[in-house]
Amino acid sequence: MADRRRVHAWARARPAAPEPAPPTPSAAAPSVAPGPAATPPDPAVEQEFTRLQTQYDARLGLYAVDTGSGESVAFRADERFAFASTFKALAAAAVLDSTTPQQLDQVVRYSKDELLENSPITKDHVATGMTLRELCDAAVRFSDNTAGNLLLKHVGGPQGLDAALTAVGDEVTSADRWEPELNSAVPGDVRDTSTPRALAHDLRQFVLGDALAEDDRALLTDWLRRNTTGGTVIRAGVPADWVVGDKTGSGYYGGRNDIAVLWPPNRAPIVMAVMTSREEPRAKRADALLADAARVAVTALG
């Protein structure tokens, strides 16, 4: 039976992946495409988010949408934050969209010199290599940095990821560098940044929309639901009987992010992206802020 996967044009001709480049001055931010009309903000909800920013001494951005009712909650949802390791879920989606099941099981070889810090899975498989399927699992579920770079390399580097996101309607996210440089999160630098609204859009397209073939959606959803790094963020702020699939990210300047699809019992899914930052380069991340913000958002959505 013929494979019915849609392989986008960006995936058919992958340019050679460039080496990580040294920091350069900020580029101009890409234009933000207009989205659907937003739910009018609730002053009480905005006040609660503002209070959380003060409590945690951090900048908070959040976007959540009930895919059943269309109701949304937004707070600084169109401001830029460094996306950090959340990109790994999007890169995995791009890999899925550009491969057949047989190609997913092809072994990717890499050297010890390519290993990065925070590579708990790939560090144990240098001698044997790993399949693309295994690398996606390692990147999404364990936030393995080496796996993340290998996925980027497969789709044509940051430029290839940008093209894949543009194909699903994201003209906001700017993918520019590789792990670990993409985590620098210097205020005002638009490289490797996105917005809560844009990341929520991407995740919705890949997990709930038709951007991926059905079997690819199922794979990505499974990896997100079995993520091992998200227990203290969005998952901690929603009812225990909700199913959550998420991808976290952390960077300098206290950057801490989580993008998730939430499945409440007997309701349509909720898609949520929470992004945070602080003023000092070595500031600690505040996981509890993301959990508290998620709690406020789901309460507001009812």
Swiss-Prot record:
Keywords: Antibiotic resistance, Hydrolase, Secreted, Signal
Biased composition (Basic residues): 1-11
Enzyme type, top EC level: hydrolase
Pfam families named among the record's database cross-references: Beta-lactamase2
Residues where substrate binds: S143, K247, T248, G249
Keyword Signal: yes
Entry keyword annotation includes Hydrolase: yes
Main location: secreted
Gene Ontology cellular component annotations, sorted alphabetically: extracellular region
Reaction it catalyzes: a beta-lactam + H2O = a substituted beta-amino acid
MF-aspect GO terms: beta-lactamase activity
Region annotation Disordered: where it falls in the sequence: 1-43
Active site: residue positions: S85, E179
Function: Active on penicillins but not on cephalosporins.
Stated name of the protein: Beta-lactamase
Native source organism of the sequence: Amycolatopsis lactamdurans (Nocardia lactamdurans)
High-level lineage: Bacteria, Bacillati, Actinomycetota, Actinomycetes, Pseudonocardiales
